[in-house]
């Protein structure tokens, strides 16, 4: 996965001059994510808010089609609520997954490039994963239970706001893992994570890009 990410970055950095218009800038925002799939016994998953931030490079392919490369840091996670015999489930654990992420997106622009629809793949490499016990505040490393790579499908809608030469973009994006993230070879029965699960969630992103 690291080799794929490096190859894509090198390819686009050395081929910037072949595109009709190139923009570079910064992007950041929030992600509300959770796990989908099997849940531990007597438990359910709920959403957790994380952060993302990184760089963005937009390459204009045609008048209405833009290729966007966005290397970044991305934080995913979930809360795990257990049935403790009360009317409502009680949050007991919080899981956090820190990724180096490389979304490769295609944007289709409309209305004089003021709005766009985006779709693509997000290649992620897991840097760290932890579970925090909300009750006693203890934290446990769970890297051995999670695969160190992920590929997600992404779909989004955005608005471009020109402010002279720079452009500010606001985007709402949905992200869904395509792979089972559980490391079955080392998972243990009765652990926090089951044998099959994926991450999914919504991101709200703000970007500013400059023509070069």
Which residue ranges define each predicted feature?
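Predominantly the C-terminal beta-signal and adjacent terminal strand-loop region
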Residues: 79, 145-155, 159-212
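Short glycine/proline- and aromatic-enriched beta-strand/turn motifs that initiate or cap beta-hairpins
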Residues: 20-58, 67, 211
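Gram-negative (and chloroplast) outer-membrane scaffold detector with strong preference
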Residues: 22, 30, 58-132, 161-166, ...
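Flexible, solvent-exposed loop segments that connect beta-strands
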Residues: 35-45, 76-98, 127-149, 180-197
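Bacterial Sec-dependent N-terminal signal peptides
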Residues: 1-27, 202, 206-212
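A broad helix-preferring feature
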Residues: 52-56, 116, 152-154
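Residues that define the transmembrane beta-barrel architecture of outer-membrane proteins
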Residues: 22, 47-51, 96-100, 147-153, ...
């Amino acid at each position: 996965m690291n080799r794929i990410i490096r190859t894509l970055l090198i390819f686009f950095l050395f081929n910037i001059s072949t595109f009709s218009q190139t923009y570079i800038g910064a992007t950041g925002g929030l992600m509300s994510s959770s796990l989908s799939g099997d849940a531990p016994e007597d438990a359910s998953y709920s959403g957790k808010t994380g952060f993302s931030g990184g760089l963005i490079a937009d390459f204009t392919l045609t008048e209405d089609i833009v290729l966007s490369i966005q290397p970044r840091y991305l934080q995913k996670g979930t809360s795990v609520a257990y049935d403790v015999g009360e009317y409502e489930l009680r949050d007991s654990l919080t899981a956090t997954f820190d990724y180096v992420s490389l979304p490769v997106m295609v944007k289709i622009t409309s209305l004089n490039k003021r709005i766009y629809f985006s779709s693509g793949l997000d290649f992620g490499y897991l840097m760290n994963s932890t579970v925090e016990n909300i009750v006693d505040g203890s934290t446990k490393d769970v890297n051995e239970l999670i695969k160190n790579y992920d590929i997600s499908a992404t779909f989004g809608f955005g608005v471009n706001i020109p402010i002279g030469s720079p452009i500010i973009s606001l985007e709402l994006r949905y992200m869904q893992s395509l792979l089972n993230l559980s490391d079955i070879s080392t998972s243990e029965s009765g652990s926090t994570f089951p044998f099959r699960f994926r991450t999914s969630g919504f991101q709200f992103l703000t970007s500013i890009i400059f023509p070069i």
